[in-house]
Amino acid sequence: MRSLLILVLCFLPLAAPGKVYGRCELAAAMKRMGLDNYRGYSLGNWVCAAKFESNFNTGATNRNTDGSTDYGILQINSRWWCNDGRTPGSKNLCHIPCSALLSSDITASVNCAKKIVSDGNGMNAWVAWRKHCKGTDVNVWIRGCRL
């Protein structure tokens, strides 16, 4: 029994933190946090970006070929925006640990996204937004939601 407990405890750190949001649940949270029309981008843009970046999963991580990693519901990159302790030359422009972006509480992700979108490139900073959302009817992502 004791060895089983030790085995279980060994695997606990491997469990991904975070939450998979529902579409409307995420839209409501993002609206509460001031993303609707932030820097001219409607709420639908943000929900669409989250869908194609992480499939609404706050615990999502993706390693890039340059050695950096994208974190959280909006896949914020460790080269520029957060510190994961393993990306050489990280700028950490949001002044946060990347682990904060994996929380079920999306406050850190939203606050950092506001800095990113204000940096000059707007939402073009997100590849998935450029590929799947830009120039499309993003209102479909909030249609039917009680906001």
UniProtKB/Swiss-Prot annotation:
<protein>
    <recommendedName>
        <fullName>Lysozyme C</fullName>
        <ecNumber>3.2.1.17</ecNumber>
    </recommendedName>
</protein>
<feature type="disulfide bond">
    <location>
        <begin position="24"/>
        <end position="145"/>
    </location>
</feature>
<feature type="disulfide bond">
    <location>
        <begin position="94"/>
        <end position="112"/>
    </location>
</feature>
<comment type="subunit">
    <text>Monomer.</text>
</comment>
<dbReference type="GO" id="GO:0003796">
    <property type="term" value="F:lysozyme activity"/>
</dbReference>
<dbReference type="InterPro" id="IPR019799">
    <property type="entry name" value="Glyco_hydro_22_CS"/>
</dbReference>
<dbReference type="GO" id="GO:0050829">
    <property type="term" value="P:defense response to Gram-negative bacterium"/>
</dbReference>
<dbReference type="InterPro" id="IPR001916">
    <property type="entry name" value="Glyco_hydro_22"/>
</dbReference>
<feature type="disulfide bond">
    <location>
        <begin position="82"/>
        <end position="98"/>
    </location>
</feature>
<keyword id="KW-0378">Hydrolase</keyword>
<feature type="signal peptide">
    <location>
        <begin position="1"/>
        <end position="17"/>
    </location>
</feature>
<keyword id="KW-0326">Glycosidase</keyword>
<comment type="function">
    <text>Lysozymes have primarily a bacteriolytic function; those in tissues and body fluids are associated with the monocyte-macrophage system and enhance the activity of immunoagents.</text>
</comment>
<dbReference type="GO" id="GO:0031640">
    <property type="term" value="P:killing of cells of another organism"/>
</dbReference>
<dbReference type="Pfam" id="PF00062">
    <property type="entry name" value="Lys"/>
</dbReference>
<comment type="similarity">
    <text>Belongs to the glycosyl hydrolase 22 family.</text>
</comment>
<keyword id="KW-0964">Secreted</keyword>
<feature type="disulfide bond">
    <location>
        <begin position="48"/>
        <end position="133"/>
    </location>
</feature>
<feature type="active site">
    <location>
        <position position="70"/>
    </location>
</feature>
<keyword id="KW-0929">Antimicrobial</keyword>
<dbReference type="GO" id="GO:0050830">
    <property type="term" value="P:defense response to Gram-positive bacterium"/>
</dbReference>
<dbReference type="InterPro" id="IPR000974">
    <property type="entry name" value="Glyco_hydro_22_lys"/>
</dbReference>
<keyword id="KW-0081">Bacteriolytic enzyme</keyword>
<feature type="domain" description="C-type lysozyme">
    <location>
        <begin position="19"/>
        <end position="147"/>
    </location>
</feature>
<keyword id="KW-0732">Signal</keyword>
<feature type="active site">
    <location>
        <position position="53"/>
    </location>
</feature>
<dbReference type="GO" id="GO:0005576">
    <property type="term" value="C:extracellular region"/>
</dbReference>
<keyword id="KW-1015">Disulfide bond</keyword>
<dbReference type="InterPro" id="IPR023346">
    <property type="entry name" value="Lysozyme-like_dom_sf"/>
</dbReference>
